[in-house]
Amino acid sequence: MQKQARKQITLYSDGSSLGNPGPGGYGGILEYKGSRKEYFGGEEETTNNRMELRGVIEGLKLLKEPCDVEVVSDSSYVVKAINEWLESWIRRDFKKVKNVDLWKAYIEAAAPHHVHGTWVRGHDGHPENERCDELARNEAERIKASL
């Protein structure tokens, strides 16, 4: 019996916080074979790093089956954690790690998938990153206006 190949998904994500901490938003795009799904959300009191990470978590939660996922982000915090730091954080039981609640949520959301992070320079003309930034900023502004 031949094992079926996993779908290759690209997850673009960005986060924004007005005040850091302050109202914040995240925006993301899931891409598969040319199809795109945008998503966004936010919180009343948060930081940019929390929103960067929430954007990835929420995107992973939208996937309905195990996939190979490339996370594309302008957050070196998120990309380096995914690719380099997370295993040692787990071994050290997250001692001295910020946003432990979200990293544990990330681990749960990422568990069925193979996830790798790719860093892109922010505000550098990368269309998907620019769109995610727009979604995140719009959500942060919407939340700020509602307070």
Swiss-Prot record:
The record's free-text note on cofactor binding: Binds 1 Mg(2+) ion per subunit. May bind a second metal ion at a regulatory site, or after substrate binding.
InterPro entries per UniProt: RNase_H, RNaseH-like_sf, RNaseH_domain, RNaseH_sf, RNaseHI
A single MF term (Gene Ontology): magnesium ion binding
Annotated residues for binding of Mg(2+) 1: 14, 52, 74
Residues reported in the UniProt entry to bind Mg(2+) 2: 14, 133
EC category: hydrolase
EC assignment: 3.1.26.4
Keywords, in A-Z order: Cytoplasm, Endonuclease, Hydrolase, Magnesium, Metal-binding, Nuclease
Entry-linked PROSITE patterns: RNASE_H_1
Catalytic reactions on record: Endonucleolytic cleavage to 5'-phosphomonoester
GO cellular component: cytoplasm
Ranges where the RNase H type-1 domain occurs: 5-141
Cell compartments where the protein resides: Cytoplasm
Superkingdom, natural source: Bacteria
One Gene Ontology term from the biological process aspect of the record: DNA replication, removal of RNA primer
Keyword Cytoplasm found: yes
Swiss-Prot/TrEMBL cofactor(s): Mg(2+)
UniProt keyword rRNA processing, yes or no: no
Function: Endonuclease that specifically degrades the RNA of RNA-DNA hybrids.
Assigned protein family: Belongs to the RNase H family.
Subunit structure: Monomer.
Family matches, as HAMAP family: RNase_H (MF_00042)
Protein name, as recorded: Ribonuclease H
Source organism of this protein record: Sulfurovum sp. (strain NBC37-1)
